[in-house]
Amino acid sequence: MLRRALLCLALTALFRAGAGAPDEEDHVLVLHKGNFDEALAAHKYLLVEFYAPWCGHCKALAPEYAKAAGKLKAEGSEIRLAKVDATEESDLAQQYGVRGYPTIKFFKNGDTASPKEYTAGREADDIVNWLKKRTGPAASTLSDGAAAEALVESSEVAVIGFFKDMESDSAKQFFLAAEVIDDIPFGITSNSDVFSKYQLDKDGVVLFKKFDEGRNNFEGEVTKEKLLDFIKHNQLPLVIEFTEQTAPKIFGGEIKTHILLFLPKSVSDYEGKLSNFKKAAESFKGKILFIFIDSDHTDNQRILEFFGLKKEECPAVRLITLEEEMTKYKPESDELTAEKITEFCHRFLEGKIKPHLMSQELPDDWDKQPVKVLVGKNFEEVAFDEKKNVFVEFYAPWCGHCKQLAPIWDKLGETYKDHENIVIAKMDSTANEVEAVKVHSFPTLKFFPASADRTVIDYNGERTLDGFKKFLESGGQDGAGDDDDLEDLEEAEEPDLEEDDDQKAVKDEL
């Protein structure tokens, strides 16, 4: 009887343990509230993706995430990858501050208080390299040629430091640089056979890559800053295709001037046009990032709209700077020769190219409705009319918040249609740009009071008819504020980064 009771207890314990154990899909642990803590306790290093099943970015990440999980598991690594459906596990999502999809957190030793946000690229190599940097030495010691070859083959880009004295000042500087870069594997060696294998007879640093010239040898004094600059200049291809996976590398880098070739892969002489673009890129390494975009791909249509381009206008070239403000530039010539592209880049760097501001044609009936229609060509005249108080909505046709606001804005226009000095207006900011106003989120609401000093007041009050009326009747005071606050509110209201109405989302998609 006692034996039977003990057997029942043992079976019950086994059943309970099995019920909570995570399932696996393609080597990725499937977590939920019932097994999350157990997984943290069982695995020293755990990378967790919080996703939504309908999220396009999550779907694009899935195969690379699974590939990374499989690679680590095959190596016998202590690192495991996991995922949580945040739409089903809202408590977990809230606990870990999930505001967009995918959100990826790295847990070390079961620490739930301060998991580290994953910020590197979305290819398997990027994920693996980032995790290894977080769990091991900044640079692995390469004791023989096989170890060095394995490191070089493990990733699209790898960096090896060759130092006969691994305690030298140069070697220490190398380690400092290695600690800064998360998504590239670093190795260090003093082995003479490894020196010979890669044709080095003295100390040096080599960046190996599976594209372009294959390797770059560092020249000069080895310092952390110079090494970081060397890697920045050489880690990306001369020309990189924009994809879901390459986007973090493109926008996470230090090069903030990008020239874009919108090139349909179906176009005649596709290879020739791409070759011209690549030839031009050789003169601007580390200064301008050369990117090509398949303009036929449906996922890239928003980017074309952002630049005011239509598919039938491609191939085409545009340049953009991604500093505090995004500024676009358009070549004077439509020729896509290497010479013309090179000349355009030189003129831009010399400050001889003016920003390109888009504008639609002015509709004949732009002022016939209570809400006036503004485009780039009539904005200055209407918004800065010294005798009128002009309240403008800057919107995007695809923006959900703008669609919700539209009937209220129309009622506001109706309210003031006969007012002697108040004008209600709107402008499609995806097709029109003006130098006086930089739009960072949609909708952006700005008030231009009647005056000669070109004052602009941001509206950050309630988006209601009463709220707008109080603002106008108070002369632009009741509801005035910094539009940065509104941007944060929009992100809080709509946590899906894929549908984020912030113009920065377009930057992420470029």
UniProtKB/Swiss-Prot annotation:
Thioredoxin domain location: 27-136, 351-477
N6-succinyllysine PTM positions: 224, 273
Enzyme class: isomerase
Site feature (Lowers pKa of C-terminal Cys of first active site) residues: 122
Residue window of motif Prevents secretion from ER: 507-510
GO BP: any one term: response to endoplasmic reticulum stress
Phosphoserine modification, residue list: 333, 359, 429
Region (Disordered): 473-510
Source superkingdom: Eukaryota
Site (Contributes to redox potential value): 56-57, 400-401
Family from the record: Belongs to the protein disulfide isomerase family.
Subunit composition and interactions: Heterodimer; heterodimerizes with the protein microsomal triglyceride transfer MTTP. Homodimer. Monomers and homotetramers may also occur. Interacts with P4HA2, forming a heterotetramer consisting of 2 alpha subunits (P4HA2) and 2 beta (P4HB), where P4HB plays the role of a structural subunit; this tetramer catalyzes the formation of 4-hydroxyproline in collagen. Also constitutes the structural subunit of the microsomal triacylglycerol transfer protein MTTP in mammalian cells. Stabilizes both enzymes and retain them in the ER without contributing to the catalytic activity. Binds UBQLN1.
UniProt-recorded name of the protein: Protein disulfide-isomerase
Protein source organism: Bos taurus (Bovine)
